[in-house]
Amino acid sequence: MSVHEVNHPLVKHKIGLMREAGISTKKFRELTSEIASLLAYEASRDFQIEPRTITGWDGSKVGIQQLKGKKVTVVPILRAGIGMLDGVLDMIPNAKVSVVGLARNEETLEAHTYFERFVGNLDERLALIIDPMLATGGSMAATIEMLKNNGCLQIRVLCLVAAPEGLARITAAYPEIDIYVAAIDERLNEQGYILPGLGDAGDKIFGTK
């Protein structure tokens, strides 16, 4: 599979607005959700459809198209992934929600799990993992492993900003997984933050420091 950087003018404009140092919590949340919707649109481009006949407004039969047999679970990585959830559900409202809680060790930059709750029948579902920042790739790799260990066979990743280091880690370990990203930035700093990045997305979404 591959990395898909969404080079749409609206996506690039919105990501640019998110980089402003003085952006408000309200605006950051709104833009996170809006970009998440656009990423979900791109990630669902290959969903199959099938014909169906319905009764139209005037009582006549109307042929329409509907999604065919695609069961989706959206998997936000706590806590920042919650900021993308509504945007994805706006596009795929029937999706089930699974949750993974991970915290990063600031010394090793690796993730440890403190919570997980998956929907049933993961082997029949496409999992869309959502997390605004793909930095070292530690949290993403841990989430992918948890999904695989619980039987999930189809996984895609949606994130706002990714560092080359994180992308390299995930694509090397999981070449079968598609990654949809709004922007690929320059690098990580010594603390594992993406540059130029967005800062701490969790703090900006939740209004904490």
UniProtKB/Swiss-Prot annotation:
<comment type="similarity">
    <text>Belongs to the UPRTase family.</text>
</comment>
<dbReference type="InterPro" id="IPR000836">
    <property type="entry name" value="PRibTrfase_dom"/>
</dbReference>
<feature type="binding site">
    <location>
        <position position="104"/>
    </location>
    <ligand>
        <name>5-phospho-alpha-D-ribose 1-diphosphate</name>
    </ligand>
</feature>
<dbReference type="GO" id="GO:0044206">
    <property type="term" value="P:UMP salvage"/>
</dbReference>
<feature type="binding site">
    <location>
        <position position="194"/>
    </location>
    <ligand>
        <name>uracil</name>
    </ligand>
</feature>
<feature type="binding site">
    <location>
        <position position="200"/>
    </location>
    <ligand>
        <name>5-phospho-alpha-D-ribose 1-diphosphate</name>
    </ligand>
</feature>
<dbReference type="Pfam" id="PF14681">
    <property type="entry name" value="UPRTase"/>
</dbReference>
<keyword id="KW-0342">GTP-binding</keyword>
<dbReference type="GO" id="GO:0004845">
    <property type="term" value="F:uracil phosphoribosyltransferase activity"/>
</dbReference>
<comment type="pathway">
    <text>Pyrimidine metabolism; UMP biosynthesis via salvage pathway; UMP from uracil: step 1/1.</text>
</comment>
<keyword id="KW-0460">Magnesium</keyword>
<dbReference type="InterPro" id="IPR029057">
    <property type="entry name" value="PRTase-like"/>
</dbReference>
<keyword id="KW-0547">Nucleotide-binding</keyword>
<dbReference type="GO" id="GO:0005525">
    <property type="term" value="F:GTP binding"/>
</dbReference>
<dbReference type="GO" id="GO:0000287">
    <property type="term" value="F:magnesium ion binding"/>
</dbReference>
<feature type="binding site">
    <location>
        <begin position="199"/>
        <end position="201"/>
    </location>
    <ligand>
        <name>uracil</name>
    </ligand>
</feature>
<keyword id="KW-0021">Allosteric enzyme</keyword>
<dbReference type="InterPro" id="IPR050054">
    <property type="entry name" value="UPRTase/APRTase"/>
</dbReference>
<keyword id="KW-0808">Transferase</keyword>
<dbReference type="InterPro" id="IPR005765">
    <property type="entry name" value="Ura_phspho_trans"/>
</dbReference>
<comment type="function">
    <text>Catalyzes the conversion of uracil and 5-phospho-alpha-D-ribose 1-diphosphate (PRPP) to UMP and diphosphate.</text>
</comment>
<feature type="binding site">
    <location>
        <begin position="131"/>
        <end position="139"/>
    </location>
    <ligand>
        <name>5-phospho-alpha-D-ribose 1-diphosphate</name>
    </ligand>
</feature>
<dbReference type="InterPro" id="IPR034332">
    <property type="entry name" value="Upp_B"/>
</dbReference>
<keyword id="KW-0328">Glycosyltransferase</keyword>
<dbReference type="GO" id="GO:0006223">
    <property type="term" value="P:uracil salvage"/>
</dbReference>
<feature type="binding site">
    <location>
        <position position="79"/>
    </location>
    <ligand>
        <name>5-phospho-alpha-D-ribose 1-diphosphate</name>
    </ligand>
</feature>
<protein>
    <recommendedName>
        <fullName>Uracil phosphoribosyltransferase</fullName>
        <ecNumber>2.4.2.9</ecNumber>
    </recommendedName>
</protein>
